[in-house]
Amino acid sequence: MSTIPENLKYADSHEWVLDNGDGTVTVGITDHAQDLLGDVVYVELPEVGTEVTATEQFSLVESVKAASDIYAPVNGEVIEVNDALNDAPELINEAPFEGAWIAKIKLSNAADLDKLLDAAGYSATIA
């Protein structure tokens, strides 16, 4: 059974979103997604300064099984990326909700968060 923290929001494309409370969010992929992918061997990080659009591809995760596009769950600008994933992509498997965030995004519109699923809603999509 996948871990689904209650304090996060979720996209049905398996990204999690942490509202940092300052107009920014932290984004990663869910435990369910990393489990489906298997051992992650590479993460293509977005460029800082990139404008992202909700539901459009902004990153890529490659595993021993497959390559999977990662979709922006909100509209905004990438303000920071997790460079630790360049040297340790396996963090996605080991700690998908802690050390393995992919990017921090400055929201264009805070209302985007209202369009995301809560933990119960996400749990229902993967049941």
Swiss-Prot record:
The keyword Disulfide bond does not apply. Keywords: Lipoyl. Residues 24-106 form the Lipoyl-binding domain. Pfam families: GCV_H. One of its GO terms (biological process) is glycine decarboxylation via glycine cleavage system. InterPro entries: 2-oxoA_DH_lipoyl-BS (IPR003016), Biotin_lipoyl (IPR000089), GCV_H (IPR002930), GCV_H/Fam206 (IPR033753), GCV_H_sub (IPR017453), Single_hybrid_motif (IPR011053). SUPFAM superfamilies: Single hybrid motif. Binds 1 lipoyl cofactor covalently. GO terms for cellular component: cytosol; glycine cleavage complex. The modification N6-lipoyllysine is found at K65. The keyword Membrane does not apply. Its cofactor is (R)-lipoate. Belongs to the GcvH family. The glycine cleavage system is composed of four proteins: P, T, L and H. NCBIfam families: gcvH, PRK01202.1. The glycine cleavage system catalyzes the degradation of glycine. The H protein shuttles the methylamine group of glycine from the P protein to the T protein. This is Glycine cleavage system H protein. The gene is gcvH.
